[in-house]
């Protein structure tokens, strides 16, 4: 059992529903009634619950009763025994029954000890030959070597360790088991007082053992992941869909992989075994590969991705992406205008990414039945995380990526106070009007028409004032002076819109701006104001941070006063932790803005598409005053021109990504929370893939899937196809893809 090949299918729950034969999976839990509840309690407290998680049925039987004598072990796929003592009535006969059971395909897990070293009659005791008839089938050889010893060092297989804070200070039993099989995995190894190493827990495809009080630590914590142990024993032919990263830690790469929800290992140096990984991502200064392990991995069909700099340095104005990487609009380009160090393509390599000046930035070359992909590490920036993922995943024989599939459109700073100002940008286009007239008689009606035309939802971010007050008194005179604001609020309340909040004013909720008592006071004041202006039934679920800035202090104070807030809007362009899609508090998610403004259309399209590549989402913000904001309308475009731009943007997104679902921010928050907290488990063989979700997940869940061969789906359906990219909706707890 190679540890990188056989991976436990975390939450293989409901897998039994996929085949009628799997419904028969059943375990037998054995204990001795004479031990006054020892084995019985262990079986019910620790073993049975893990079997239930896997929907494995079980029987619990006292091995010292007639019930056991009348039981056929062959009716069970797994036998788990747990005994404290070594005495057994008719011990040899018991060992022979275990031997016959294993020889006929059964699997045995021994907890504590085999329980039949001595015949309770006092005569006819088993010898090493009888004991090893069972142990040898499990892959070990046993000798009489029992002793008590205080552990000097306890090593637990990291892939099976149930808790990272285990304690082993007390004296414990140890006994020697020599591995004779090539497919045995040590679970727990103990260096005892004699400085010898003892294998006190191990696992093989046929069974295993967790010996002599090493199931629990000194504090009663379970030491090994029993669900995984049982999963490997029963479903051992499967492996996790998993990636390997080799090299120094890289934040952008780690976040890009985290957002895929896929399993990955990260090691500073190359391990000797690579089997079982769908791809190896190698952070290296050079592209030359002289490592035999990597070369053999590629020759056998593996994919190696080299992330490095290179010998060529050029300023890249734009990056061009084709539909071979990801479905993109016609003439799609990513504005970059940065220096990039990259490696010239190798002879006979295939081009993946180019610049607008025809520089080959990323390429791949076939090696044996596998491939080498080169990607310049200078392009591994936050905005381009999704581009890296899609470049790599588009080249794998089979790839799958969970995605959110939800986007929201925000009317930021709306409804907003107005001041009856006559602004040049407005009077030039519309004549003698004020900002009040523009916001509420031109901009808002046209935005409503836009929503009607494209069938989109708006989440607004209401701001009451633009004053700079951070100390008492807190008043709402600006709102009172703008009667149109109250009218618009009521219209939003009565219509199909979501009213989010921006705050009492536009001062970000940070420790540097507010004292704790003043912030608490202004938030309570704003809450009372909302009740007075709207109604008692109105509850804000969305908060958009002014200037997209909030810190942990501000978020904590906000949620104290507004505990129902489920979405906090920031910006993806920032570098702090609150600029990432994440969960804070009990059930609040940070939803950073990925796209904003009306133009350039190519820029807002590329920002959105890059976000769709990364997570299957984008968050789009516009403001009522964008038209006369010098930083947001640097080209002094008219409102008519900007309105045409936003129509072009939305129509393009809907044309090329019709599978994307539009939601209010609060609705999207629920989806993102589920996405971030209820991770699917993805496992596969050469012929099929299983995607299993935790219980009580909301459906559907969505995935990008690529496969180089035909497939069928049960438990899900295809909702979109473009070239070799399939968008899949999972509709059941378990989705099965058969190739």
Would you name each region that the model predicts?
Residues 115-153, 242-247, 298-300, 307-318, ...:
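Metal-dependent polysaccharide deacetylase catalytic core of the NodB/CE4 family, i.e.
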Residues 380-490, 495:
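Active-site beta->alpha N-cap acidic-glycine motif
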């Amino acid at each position: 059992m190679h540890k990188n090949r056989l991976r436990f299918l975390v939450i293989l729950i409901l897998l039994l529903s996929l085949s009628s034969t799997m419904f028969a999976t059943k375990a037998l839990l054995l204990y001795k009634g004479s031990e006054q509840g020892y084995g019985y309690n262990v079986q019910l407290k620790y073993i049975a619950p893990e079997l239930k998680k896997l929907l494995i049925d079980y029987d619990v039987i006292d091995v010292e009763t007639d019930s056991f004598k009348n039981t056929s072990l062959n009716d069970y796929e797994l036998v788990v025994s747990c005994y404290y003592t070594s005495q057994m009535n008719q011990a040899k006969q018991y060992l022979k029954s275990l031997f016959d059971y294993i020889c006929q395909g059964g699997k045995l897990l021994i907890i504590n000890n085999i329980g039949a070293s001595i015949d309770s009659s006092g005569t006819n005791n088993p010898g090493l030959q009888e004991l090893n008839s069972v142990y040898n089938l499990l892959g070990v050889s046993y000798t009489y070597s029992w002793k008590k010893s205080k552990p000097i060092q306890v090593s637990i297989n990291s892939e099976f360790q149930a808790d990272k804070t285990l304690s082993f200070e007390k004296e414990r039993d140890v006994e020697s088991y020599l591995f004779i099989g090539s497919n045995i995995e040590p679970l727990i190894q103990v260096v005892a007082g004699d400085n010898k190493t003892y294998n006190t827990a191990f696992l093989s495809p046929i069974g295993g053992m967790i010996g002599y009080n090493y199931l629990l630590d000194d504090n009663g914590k379970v030491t090994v992941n029993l669900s995984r142990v049982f999963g490997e024993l029963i479903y051992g032919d499967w492996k996790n869909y998993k990636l390997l990263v080799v090299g120094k830690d890289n934040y952008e790469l780690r976040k890009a992989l985290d957002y895929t929800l896929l399993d990955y290992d990260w090691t500073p140096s190359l391990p000797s075994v690579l089997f079982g990984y769908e791809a190896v991502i190698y952070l290296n200064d050079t592209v030359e590969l002289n490592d035999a392990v990597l070369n053999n991995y590629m020759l056998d069909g593996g994919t190696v991705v080299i992330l490095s700099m290179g010998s060529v340095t050029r300023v890249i104005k734009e990056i061009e992406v084709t539909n071979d990487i990801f479905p993109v609009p016609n003439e799609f380009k990513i504005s970059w205008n940065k220096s990039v160090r990259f490696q010239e393509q190798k002879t006979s390599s295939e081009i993946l990414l180019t610049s607008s000046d025809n520089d080959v930035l990323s390429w791949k070359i076939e090696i044996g039945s596998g491939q080498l992909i080169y990607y310049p590490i200078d392009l591994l920036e936050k905005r381009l995380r999704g581009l890296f993922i899609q470049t790599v995943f588009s080249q794998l024989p089979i790839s799958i990526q969970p995605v959110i599939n939800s986007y929201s459109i925000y009317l930021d700073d709306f409804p907003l106070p107005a001041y009856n100002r006559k602004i040049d940008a407005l009077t030039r286009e519309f004549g003698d009007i004020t900002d009040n007239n523009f916001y509420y008689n031109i901009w808002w009606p046209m935005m409503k028409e836009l929503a009607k035309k494209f069938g989109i939802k708006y989440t607004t971010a209401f701001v009451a004032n633009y004053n700079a007050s951070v100390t008492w008194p807190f008043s709402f005179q600006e709102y009172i002076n703008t009667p149109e604001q109250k009218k618009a609020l009521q219209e939003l309340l009565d219509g199909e819109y979501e009213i989010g909040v921006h705050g009492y004013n536009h001062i970000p909720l940070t420790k540097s701006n507010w004292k704790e008592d003043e912030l608490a006071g202004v938030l309570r004041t704003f809450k009372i104001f909302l009740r007075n202006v709207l109604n008692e039934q109105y509850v804000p679920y969305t908060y958009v941070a002014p200037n997209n800035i909030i810190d942990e202090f501000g978020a904590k104070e906000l949620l104290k006063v507004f505990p129902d807030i489920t979405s906090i809007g920031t910006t993806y362009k920032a570098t702090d932790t609150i600029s990432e899609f994440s969960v804070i508090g009990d059930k609040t998610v940070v939803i950073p803005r990925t796209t904003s403004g009306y133009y350039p259309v190519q820029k807002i399209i590329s920002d959105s598409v890059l976000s769709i590549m990364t997570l299957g989402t984008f968050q789009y913000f516009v403001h009522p005053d964008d038209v006369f904001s010098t930083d947001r309308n640097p080209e002094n475009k008219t409102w008519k021109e900007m309105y045409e731009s936003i129509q072009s943007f939305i129509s393009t997104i809907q044309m090329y990504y019709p599978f994307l679902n539009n939601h209010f921010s609060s609705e999207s928050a629920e989806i993102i929370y589920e996405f971030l907290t209820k991770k699917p488990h993805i496992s596969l063989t050469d012929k099929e893939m299983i995607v299993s979700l935790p219980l009580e997940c909301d459906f559907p869940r969505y995935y990008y899937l690529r496969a180089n061969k035909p497939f069928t789906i049960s438990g899900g359906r295809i909702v979109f196809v473009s070239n070799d990219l399939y968008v899949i909706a999972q509709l059941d707890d378990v989705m099965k893809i058969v190739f």
